[in-house]
Amino acid sequence: MNKGQYFWNELWCEGRISFHKEEVNPDLIAYISSLNIPAKGRVLVPLCGKSVDMLWLVRQGYHVVGIELVEKAILQFVQEHQITVRENTTGQAKQYFTDNLNLWITDIFALNAALIEPVDAIYDRAALVALPKKLRPAYVDICLKWLKPGGSILLKTLQYNQEKVQGPPYSVSPEEIALSYQQCAKIELLKSQKRIREPNDHLFNLGISEVNDYVWRIRKG
């Protein structure tokens, strides 16, 4: 287990998962239709944790593919929502699945790419920003390989003074997004908003005075 894997396993084991939200993300609800996902289309949710957004996507009629490093996160998701799953292991990747939900337990960088069938869309609420800068280019490349031509990504990022806090979540500038996805046909900024200070906000509690949140729609050519 490398340093990054140990870090995330430790967070889940200790219950330090303030990044997990109990409510469906409002930006997902607001912008999912703009991706024009076909009926019963496949949606990839990388570094999915136990996100309730996955269940919401399934209820909209989509087939959801989640990839998560920490098995405890997936087991909690299945138990909390009383989902009856089947189990399969392929190489080093374990899979929990139903007819419309595939949850892979593995390091996304070690996963045999051929195991994931092409997807119509990718929903990234907190995956890119969970990765340090040196890993982000490889992550983008992997995801784009799984995305069908013409498919779209709904991506949420944030920007703040990285010198004060090392992350995660990491600050990702609009300039980095433009560079990282330059091979795509279209990059659209759907939303740019200064975050309102809330008592339980991790970054504000660490002394960050300003956080900007962004929502992007990126279409693969």
UniProtKB/Swiss-Prot annotation:
Tell me a GO biological process for this protein. response to metal ion
Q: What is its EC number?
A: 2.1.1.67
Superkingdom, according to UniProt? Answer: Bacteria
Q: For S-adenosyl-L-methionine, which residues are the binding ones? A: 12, 47, 68, 125
A molecular-function term among this protein's GO annotations: thiopurine S-methyltransferase activity
Keywords in alphabetical order, please.
Answer: Cytoplasm, Methyltransferase, S-adenosyl-L-methionine, Transferase
Its UniProt entry gives the catalysed reaction(s) as: S-adenosyl-L-methionine + a thiopurine = S-adenosyl-L-homocysteine + a thiopurine S-methylether
InterPro entries noted in UniProt: SAM-dependent_MTases_sf, Thiopur_S-MeTfrase_Se/Te_detox, Thiopurine_S-MeTrfase, TPMT
Q: Where in the cell is it found?
A: Cytoplasm
Q: Name one GO cellular component term.
A: cytoplasm
Q: Which Gene3D superfamilies match?
A: Vaccinia Virus protein VP39
| The keyword Ribosomal protein appears for this protein | no
Tell me the protein family, please.
Answer: Belongs to the class I-like SAM-binding methyltransferase superfamily. TPMT family.
What name is this protein filed under? Thiopurine S-methyltransferase
